[in-house]
Amino acid sequence: MKASIYDFTLKELSQLLKPSFRAKQLYLWLYAKYKTSFKDMQNNFSKDFIAYLEREFTLRTIEITHVRESVDGSKKYLFKSLRDNHTFEAVLLKMKDKKIDKETNAILEGEKYTVCVSCQIGCQVGCAFCFTQKGGFVRNLKASEIIQQALLIKEDNNLPIEKALNIVFMGMGEPLNNLDEVCKAIEIFNTGMQISPKRITISTSGVADKIPILAGKNLGVQLAISLHAVDDKTRSSLMPLNKKYNIECVLNEVKKWPLEQRKRVMFEYLLIKDLNDGLDCAKKLLKLLNGIKSKVNLILFNPHEGSKFERPSLESARMFADFLNSKGLLCTIRESKALDIEAACGQLREKKLSQQI
């Protein structure tokens, strides 16, 4: 089976293609001009080189099979692998953006886009609150399949080349359980799509022994930890992974994470009614994160079919956040985008092609 051209970093292509400058030209066609056929690249390449590319590589290995749009402008995408017909989802989040004009000091309003990508089909972690785990684990996604999620979404929305995206690994799967492909995808996002590592966030459920491996790669990405509880008993009931990597174990590795001067590690905390949303939990969380440059992102539980958990009130979430902020721990409440199309946090899963999304 031919290799996908999107699976190769710029360095790998430079070593493979002769002369090596062909790699940069090819990257320009792929990631700046969105060409999906080697024949469309004939302005730069000879017929013999085009024939070589067609013989050795394939381009698109996934396709969009369905799109569902939210009232807030967000979109959920169902992708199908052209190799094995398995499906997976990704989400485009559309948000308002405000910037200050440096010359006039005027406030400029615009839009910013975040693509929430999947790195696995299904998930092995088995978090009790997450819909993804309902379908079990199928396989890891290749770097090319991760990259194409962002490319296809950007094309589908006619976003200009220069329009920067934020990439968050918060879709289906645990990024640290597919670390090699995730890291390769990040390198290609950076060198191919020109997405700064500062715009890329990896969210992990806390695979503690792989956090230092990720840190050692010096990718410059942002780290987010799915914490969701302040004691091991509660966290283990929500996240079975905690039995292997408990809270203390995870936090010990987080403390070693290299941070730029103004950066913080994000801790994601899912608020579930009458389980972990009280002020007693907020006080324990404050104590847990003492000494760590951190910020807390509160997520109100997003209901899905078959779940026993309930969404807490916005009032209780605000009380939780206000307490942490009053004590000097930066805390925000995540706006639940795309809730009406079941594309919010914890609502993605593999679907049969006959199913609606």
UniProtKB/Swiss-Prot annotation:
Its EC number is 2.1.1.192. Residues 109-340 form the Radical SAM core domain. The active site is at residues 89, 345. Its main location: cytoplasm. InterPro entries: Aldolase_TIM (IPR013785), Methyltransferase_A (IPR040072), RlmN_N (IPR048641), RNA_MTrfase_RlmN (IPR027492), rRNA_lsu_MTrfase_RlmN/Cfr (IPR004383), rSAM (IPR007197). One of its GO terms (molecular function) is metal ion binding. Keywords: 4Fe-4S, Cytoplasm, Disulfide bond, Iron, Iron-sulfur, Metal-binding, Methyltransferase, rRNA processing, S-adenosyl-L-methionine, Transferase, tRNA processing. [4Fe-4S] cluster binds at residues 123, 127, 130. Binds 1 [4Fe-4S] cluster. The cluster is coordinated with 3 cysteines and an exchangeable S-adenosyl-L-methionine. GO terms for cellular component: cytoplasm. It comes from the Bacteria. Disulfide bonds join 116-345. It holds the Pfam family Radical_SAM. It catalyses: adenosine(2503) in 23S rRNA + 2 reduced [2Fe-2S]-[ferredoxin] + 2 S-adenosyl-L-methionine = 2-methyladenosine(2503) in 23S rRNA + 5'-deoxyadenosine + L-methionine + 2 oxidized [2Fe-2S]-[ferredoxin] + S-adenosyl-L-homocysteine; adenosine(37) in tRNA + 2 reduced [2Fe-2S]-[ferredoxin] + 2 S-adenosyl-L-methionine = 2-methyladenosine(37) in tRNA + 5'-deoxyadenosine + L-methionine + 2 oxidized [2Fe-2S]-[ferredoxin] + S-adenosyl-L-homocysteine. S-adenosyl-L-methionine binds at residues 173-174, 203, 226-228, 302. Its cofactor is [4Fe-4S] cluster. HAMAP family: RNA_methyltr_RlmN (MF_01849). Belongs to the radical SAM superfamily. RlmN family. Specifically methylates position 2 of adenine 2503 in 23S rRNA and position 2 of adenine 37 in tRNAs. m2A2503 modification seems to play a crucial role in the proofreading step occurring at the peptidyl transferase center and thus would serve to optimize ribosomal fidelity. Reaction proceeds by a ping-pong mechanism involving intermediate methylation of a conserved cysteine residue. This is Dual-specificity RNA methyltransferase RlmN.
